[in-house]
Amino acid sequence: MHLRLLKLHPNAIIPKYQHEGDSGVDLHAIEPVAIAPHKTALIKTGLAAEIPIGTELQIRPRSGLALKQSVTVLNSPGTIDANYRGEIGVILINHSDTVFEVKAGMRIAQMVMVPVMHLDITVVDKVSDTSRGTGGFGSTGT
């Protein structure tokens, strides 16, 4: 699938796959940002995209950043709709007790393109019964 990217900032790094078979490309920060403990920050990538209709871009955490630094994407996955043309930003949250320093050029998240299915919604008086019923939120044990 083809994705058209616009560099909005000279420090913007064009995302690329790190390994054959990867599902996501890495997004990079364009400037340093300090994220205080247990706080969030919007990290700029310096990129805008022309996303094909029928798809969306999802912003997902980088596992190493989450495991080693306790820093992750807050609204994961973040959704970038096909009709959005602004700068791609990444909301990071620092779950640690120390300040996390985002450095310019640092890989901060992954971006994945996925197909979108639109809903045809029908309002009904009742939904069908299943063996699970209304059981949820730990109903099968923890």
UniProtKB/Swiss-Prot annotation:
Belongs to the dUTPase family. The keyword Chaperone does not apply. GO terms for molecular function: dUTP diphosphatase activity; magnesium ion binding. CDD domains: trimeric_dUTPase (cd07557). The keyword Calcium does not apply. It is an enzyme of class 3 (hydrolase). Gene3D superfamilies: 2.70.40.10. This is Deoxyuridine 5'-triphosphate nucleotidohydrolase. NCBIfam families: dut (TIGR00576), PRK00601.1 (NF001862). It catalyses: dUTP + H2O = dUMP + diphosphate + H(+). InterPro entries: dUTPase, dUTPase-like, dUTPase-like_sf, dUTPase_trimeric. One of its GO terms (biological process) is dUMP biosynthetic process. It comes from the Bacteria. Its cofactor is Mg(2+). SUPFAM superfamilies: dUTPase-like. Pathway: Pyrimidine metabolism; dUMP biosynthesis; dUMP from dCTP (dUTP route): step 2/2. The gene is dut. Substrate binds at residues 62-64, 75, 79-81. Its EC number is 3.6.1.23. This enzyme is involved in nucleotide metabolism: it produces dUMP, the immediate precursor of thymidine nucleotides and it decreases the intracellular concentration of dUTP so that uracil cannot be incorporated into DNA. Keywords: Hydrolase, Magnesium, Metal-binding, Nucleotide metabolism. It comes from Picosynechococcus sp. (strain ATCC 27264 / PCC 7002 / PR-6) (Agmenellum quadruplicatum).
